[in-house]
């Protein structure tokens, strides 16, 4: 699913892409209306969202806008805390998309939106270290694959990183989970053929323990890219 600006709401990129992939743009006002149904979660900085057909940015851009506004309200006066909270916000958003060009477009839109919002809030550019961290998080969280088969486009299982920020000193615990493991015993609005679905995860009520595929040592969040 994709979203366009109100000023230029194209419904499709091409008829061929609609025929081949069912790719249709979604109006921004409709995206916001749907997100308003879970408004409190979209404004909680660490609330996790997974969009299983994320297109070129759709819901994720609007979720980022809401989360970054929450970061501004809480931490704008302390740049160290703002930087860390903004990384938490980005780390909590996940997407799967079938088309490689859309994956790249989605990552770029989110990155550009982050940098623009950062400048507006801090009246300065993000540090090179922070920008590198955010790019890394987006590369790990926005994946090319099929959420129905739970496989990446290279045939490997879709695997997401769980980023858990510990305390206020910038330390992060990373654990990798296969999507199939995360969705075991979980029901959500998995899209039917020709339809789209949105998974709003993180209900705060875990029902059983998921088994990580891999765990990493506690790391400073700005150094996450060093531990691929």
What are these regions (language model features)?
Residues 2-228:
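SAM-dependent methyltransferase catalytic region
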């Amino acid at each position: 699913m994709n979203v366009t600006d109100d000023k230029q709401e194209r419904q499709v990129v091409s008829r061929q892409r609609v025929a081949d992939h069912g790719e249709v743009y979604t109006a921004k006002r409709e995206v916001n209306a749907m997100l308003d149904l879970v408004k409190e979660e979209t404004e909680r900085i660490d609330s996790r969202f997974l969009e299983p057909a994320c297109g070129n940015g759709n819901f994720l851009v609007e979720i980022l806008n809401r989360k970054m506004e929450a970061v501004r309200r809480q931490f704008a006066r302390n740049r160290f805390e703002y930087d860390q909270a903004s990384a938490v916000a980005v780390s909590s958003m996940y997407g799967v998309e079938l088309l490689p060009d859309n994956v790249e477009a989605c990552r770029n839109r989110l990155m550009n939106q982050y940098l623009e919002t950062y400048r507006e809030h801090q009246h300065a550019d993000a540090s090179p270290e922070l920008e590198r961290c955010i790019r890394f998080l987006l590369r790990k969280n926005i994946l090319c694959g099929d959420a129905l088969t739970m496989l990446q486009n290279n045939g490997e299982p879709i695997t997401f990183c769980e980023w858990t920020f510990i305390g206020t000193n910038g330390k992060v615990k990373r654990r990798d989970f296969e999507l199939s493991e995360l969705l075991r015993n979980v029901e959500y609005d998995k899209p039917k053929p020709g339809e789209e679905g949105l998974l709003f995860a993180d209900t705060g009520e875990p029902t059983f323990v998921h088994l990580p595929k891999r765990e990493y040592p506690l790391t400073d969040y700005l150094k996450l890219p060093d531990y691929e």
